[in-house]
Regions:
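Accessory nucleic acid-recognition modules appended to NTPase machines
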Residues: 198, 202-337
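Pre-Walker A adenine-sensing motif
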Residues: 1-13
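Short regulatory helix/loop adjacent to the ATP-binding pocket of P-loop NTPases
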Residues: 32, 36, 138-155
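Conserved small helical "lid"/interfacial subdomain of P-loop NTPases
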Residues: 156-184
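Conserved P-loop NTPase "ATPase switch" module shared by AAA+ and STAND
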Residues: 85-115, 136
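Sensor-1/coupling segment of RecA-like P-loop NTPase cores
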Residues: 19-23, 104-107, 117-148
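Conserved NTP-binding/hydrolysis module of P-loop NTPases
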Residues: 39-43, 49, 53-72, 86-87
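Conserved lysine of the Walker
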Residues: 29
């Protein structure tokens, strides 16, 4: 990933580059992007879900200070700021990073069309290293991969950031606790799924063994307790209750559509298809030696952290609401594997 970012940064010295980075929340996208540009001039802006006018008021002084551009008057539309940046990039090479880019669709969907129009107008004579990143997979996929969307076909590079491998997780744990056991390593993998932020939280809390990891993850106030909900509600929107129920059933071992349909009492085929194709949260698994047209299809969660969250935290929310975290900790210690 870093090699792709460095290559784009170098190429942008003579011609404009447009890179998109996707990856789940907490995977380390922002840290990686900032590390790649730390020795160069860059503008970093985060798209919070607030009005376009307030965002422009927030971005304007950052742009002026970073690039030395004098901006007269109050700018109320992002398109005006983006055009100023593209015009400036004809004179000077710099990097523009827009974090949580998909949030523009909530704020003002026409911003995406404006960016396409301005990019098409200026990029041929520009020296900008333009990078956008986002963590809502379905929306980022639609923005950049749907032929009907304005920014389709504009990218020069694409990066999909994935969790750490078990080898890297082992190295991290060994750095902090050289005497770790295989049980400790397994717990770290099952709890975090290799997501950088979750591993960092545990290591900073000095939770180096199985017991300490589970205690930290499930204690009152732990960020792990709300993380699954925080991650996915914006993905699923008003239908989140149905999706959460399906994911919870899969996590606890109800892995066929027939089982899921019978419990939820409705046909979940379209939901399962969306979870697999649009959100990339589940995948089909067929038994070994099954015939190609066999209907013995099972589903499994692809994200280890979400598998843990939907198996233990989501269905036991009432226990947590009563403040009886210790009961859940005891249950998980006995059953988490």
């Amino acid at each position: 990933e870093m090699a792709i970012l460095y290559a784009a940064k170098k190429q942008s010295q003579t011609s404009a580059c447009f890179t998109v980075m996707t990856g789940r929340r907490r995977i380390g996208k922002t840290a990686l992007l900032l590390e790649s540009v730390k020795d160069t001039r860059f503008v970093y802006i985060f798209v919070a879900r607030k009005s376009e006018v307030l965002l422009c008021a927030q971005y304007q002084p950052v742009i002026q200070e970073t690039l030395g551009i004098r901006i007269y008057g109050e700018i109320r539309e992002f398109a005006q700021l983006f055009e100023l940046l593209m015009q400036h990039s004809q004179k000077e090479n710099f990097t523009l990073i827009i974090d949580e880019f998909q949030e523009f669709l909530y704020i003002n969907p026409s911003i995406v069309s404006d960016i396409q129009r301005i990019w098409d107008q200026y990029h041929a004579t520009s020296k900008i290293n333009f990078i956008v990143c986002g963590s809502v997979y379905s929306m980022m996929k639609r923005i950049f991969e749907d032929r009907k969307e304005p920014l389709y076909g504009r990218l020069t590079a694409r990066i999909s950031l994935h969790p750490f491998t078990t080898t890297v997780i082992k190295e991290i744990l060994a750095d902090h606790a050289p005497q770790f056991t295989s049980e400790d390593l397994l717990c770290l993998y099952l709890l975090t799924g290799g997501v950088a932020k979750y591993i960092t939280l545990l290591m900073e809390a000095k939770a180096f063994n199985k017991t300490a990891m589970i205690d930290y993850a499930l204690s009152e106030g732990s960020p792990f307790l709300t993380e699954g909900k925080d991650m996915l509600i914006s993905e699923f929107g008003k239908d989140y209750a149905n999706y959460f129920s399906i994911l919870s059933l899969i996590a606890e071992g109800k892995t066929t559509q027939r089982e899921i349909d019978s419990i939820i009492n409705k046909n979940t085929g379209s939901y399962l298809a969306n979870l697999e194709d649009e959100y990339s949260l589940i995948k089909k698994v067929k038994p070994m030696f099954a015939k190609p047209n066999s209907r013995a299809t099972r589903y499994c969660l692809q994200d280890n952290f979400l598998r843990f969250w939907f198996r233990f935290i989501f269905p036991n929310n009432a226990v947590l609401e009563m403040g009886k975290n210790h009961l859940l900790i005891e249950y998980v210690e006995k059953n988490y594997e």
